[in-house]
Amino acid sequence: MNHHLIITPIFHLQIMLPVATLKRPPPPAATCSIYSFSRGTPSLVSKARLSTAAVGGMKNEPSPNHYSDISSSDLNLTRRSGNYGPTMWDFEYIQSIHNDYTEKKYMNRLNKLKEEMKKMIMAEGSQELEKLELIDNLQRLGVSYHFKHEIMQILSSIKQHSTPADSLYATALKFRLFREYGFHISQEIFGGLSETHTEDTKGMLYLYEASFLATEGESELEKARNWTEKHLREYLENKNDDQNVAELVHHALELPLHWRMLRIEARWFINFYKKKQDMIPLLLELAILDFNIVQAAHIEDLKYVARWWKETCLAENLPFARDRLVENFFWTIGVNFLPQYGYFRRIETKVNALVTTIDDVYDVFGTMDELQCFTHAFQRWNIDELDNLPDNMKMCYFALDNFINEVAGDAFEEHRVPILSYLRNAWTDLCKAYLREAKWYFSKYIPTMEEYMDNAWISISAPVILVHAYFLVANPVNKEVLHYLENYHDIIRWSALILRLANDLGTSSEELKRGDVPKSIQCYMNEKKVSEEEARQHIRLLISETWKKLNEAHNVAAHPFPKMFVKCAMNLARMAQCMYQHGDGHGHGDLNSETTNHIMALLFESIPPA
């Protein structure tokens, strides 16, 4: 299906579909219902959620009395501007999209291909390496979720009967797949194998990819990553005959597979797989058809959240805030693309949209007095705190209050577990973290790295996102897990930290131009008296080290969370790497950005049949 871009005078992005597939139903009426709010039951749980440092400050931070002197009368009441551009995505166009892959005939064909593929996967006589390569292809093509039982059966059999491989490539592939699927495997499997295969480019590539599944203390994998990267870069600098291997090497050095957003990787690998000499036509047809069917499901989710967003009228009434509904939806595909989780994507898109809006209230709109009152309203969940606030800030409060009561009501109906207090606590923590950053801004205070990091992993909003995610994927909701959830288990903390650091690498320059509070790069520069490039290198190292911690948290068999929740936490970190790899992929709304290209490829451009 070919698509052509046309830019309208108001910078809306439109895609011209073939006339036969384009249907334009009248868009639904957008009625602002924001003041028709429900007042939820007050939380019965009251407890300190943030650390003492996050609430009261570190020893070098200005005292609360210092902040109390900052009043509206002391400030220039001219509101700041984030200088955000308008949304590129047209509401009527989104509602008009018709995707043929919703038709039953495509699902029937997919089911037939799946049955044929299962027979191929479980065929007798295949060698161990052939089975591992097939699993790898299934995974990178984005269709392994259809064959979870078969894959686990094969890997379990290999685990029980496997003999040491004499190939660096086979050993590295086995290591990566075992770790990805939760099987214990030691770094000792490589022994001295790696040092003797410097001419094996494919083996070095797969060892390089495997090294990113290391946990803390696995020094041999760290060494392997360093020397394989050196050899792979030298390989690209020299002329080579195998263009497929060169393309894989370039792709890996740009961003390792373990850090990549799954759906973008699937789209890229489908195009790569077409060119392989050993390509399996059945598997290629399955991957393309599955991609297009899943894309059709995502479009229906996007239509739903676009209607919701228009009905809130937040974009019209808060023009200072980023109107990034499609980008907010894109995040949810990265966290959980599976077609059966449409409710997850719809709710998490609302979370993302509200986070973005409230973040901009704190960053570019509110005065110190207003933000204090705004935060108190969220701490007490009491509308009386809103009396002296501008109407658009009241709208934010009502929109969020409506939303979390809706989510809590749905969860209680399904699980008979009251979750309102957990949702409220997570949002309160976020607003308190935003307020602390606002205090730093208004007092022109540059926090230490420790002060900044203590607050920033919460202000990046990952805890809010993942608290909601648990209630959206857990079935049943386990009351014993809620303690780990509300205290932000390491799985949440490390995912949040990667999101924060990746965000800082991609956005700090632009945010400083707007006058925002310093980010980790500037805090480190100020504290250590180093250059910006040295600070950026330090942040990249922190990201790498945090991935090791997240890998460890993922691998610990004793963690209390369902596998799907852990995958969501891992995928949120991957999505951060994707969104901020080439700058601010969330806030800019740039037509030519990588984010726009990714959104086009995942949502609006079907893959033609092979």
Swiss-Prot record:
Pathway info: Secondary metabolite biosynthesis; terpenoid biosynthesis
Cofactor(s), names only, from the UniProt record: Mg(2+); Mn(2+)
Gene Ontology molecular function: (E)-beta-ocimene synthase activity; 1,8-cineole synthase activity; magnesium ion binding; myrcene synthase activity; sabinene synthase activity
Family annotation (CDD domains): Terpene_cyclase_plant_C1 (cd00684)
Protein family: Belongs to the terpene synthase family. Tpsb subfamily.
Note describing how the cofactor binds: Binds 3 Mg(2+) or Mn(2+) ions per subunit.
Location of the protein in the cell: Plastid, Chloroplast
Listed GO CC annotations: chloroplast
Entry protein name: 1,8-cineol synthase, chloroplastic
